[in-house]
Amino acid sequence: MATAVHRNGSLTPVSLRVFVLVGFGGGALTQALLFAVFLVLYVVTVLGNLTMIVVITLDARLHSPMYFFLKNLSFVDLCYSSAIAPNALANFLSTSKVISFEACATQFFFFSLLATTETFLLAVMAYDRFMAICSPLRYPVTMCPTTCTRLVLGTFCVGCLNSIVQTSLTFQLPFCSSNRIDHFYCDVPPLLQLACASTALNELFLFGLCGFIIVSTTLAVLVSYGYITVTILRMHSGSGRHKVFSTCGSHLTAVSLFYGTLFVMYAQPGALTSMEQGKVVSIFYTLVIPMLNPLIYSLRNKDVKDALQRLGQRHSLVKAVRGCPAAGGNASV
């Protein structure tokens, strides 16, 4: 424990201002392999999500509420992984693996903000599908551009509020027992283990707030898809059912992956008993899921695949036009 020695010989705990991210341990070869894995995951994540953002922005046929939310999901995923991956990559190549108190708090703030935002954004996307399938006549009025913008801003506001509460409660604690965070980024469970004061309030808020967020948004998704399922069963057109399944199937896959990993990480106390297990799960929802989401929505969505094809053809046409000589430029006089 870090201490300060007074003139009378008494000792007082001193809160640490620097942390060491232990990560996964191992020798130089292990660190190099982890660096390669993280780098590939992060590069694919960045390219995939940037592609989705560009395609949806440039293709007028994708300017609808569903793709507006999908573009924002790609933006959140891009920022989400960028809050974790660059620092982790730098630590794999470093021997000190030091992160300052302020940098740790900043990383956790954005991580918590973006994770909460994505949780609510997925619920909003489920509501959008519910309105489109179950109330198609009211859909254009209900999900107008103003409403969609407000819903997205609302998810960010809720995420920011939750992040402020979690960050304030966590980083007001005195960290004096050790400065070694048994993780590859700053997260609440390993940080609470370093505190030399009672963490009961923090644990209550951690499991209470995270539990409420996960349960409430999961219920919203389940209710939305419950109504969607009933509507699908009443459809007489096979092509209509197939189209609904193709659009909703992608979202259900993304929801299942994201909510499932969050539930394992935060809603089950037993999952926190093993930090190594927590690290593996953390890789999944900080890097793997943001990497998979663009693939899930592009490979299983005909509109996105067609938009990608049109964008590719447009790019090829522009290159061909630029490569052609000016008319008459090579003609003999």
Swiss-Prot record:
This is Olfactory receptor 9S13. Odorant receptor. It is a multi-pass membrane protein. Residues 57-72, 128-150, 225-251, 300-333 are cytoplasmic. InterPro entries: GPCR_Rhodpsn (IPR000276), GPCR_Rhodpsn_7TM (IPR017452), Olfact_rcpt (IPR000725). PROSITE patterns: G_PROTEIN_RECEP_F1_1, G_PROTEIN_RECEP_F1_2. It is found in: Cell membrane. Residues 1-35, 94-106, 172-203, 273-278 are extracellular. Belongs to the G-protein coupled receptor 1 family. One of its GO terms (cellular component) is membrane. Glycans are attached at N8. Coiled coil: none annotated. The chain crosses the membrane at residues 36-56, 73-93, 107-127, 151-171, 204-224, 252-272, 279-299. It holds the Pfam family 7tm_4. It comes from Mus musculus (Mouse). The lineage of its organism: Eukaryota, Metazoa, Chordata, Craniata, Vertebrata. Disulfide bonds join C104-C196. GO terms for biological process: G protein-coupled receptor signaling pathway; sensory perception of smell. Keywords: Cell membrane, Disulfide bond, G-protein coupled receptor, Glycoprotein, Membrane, Olfaction, Receptor, Sensory transduction, Transducer, Transmembrane, Transmembrane helix. Its main location: membrane. One of its GO terms (molecular function) is G protein-coupled receptor activity.
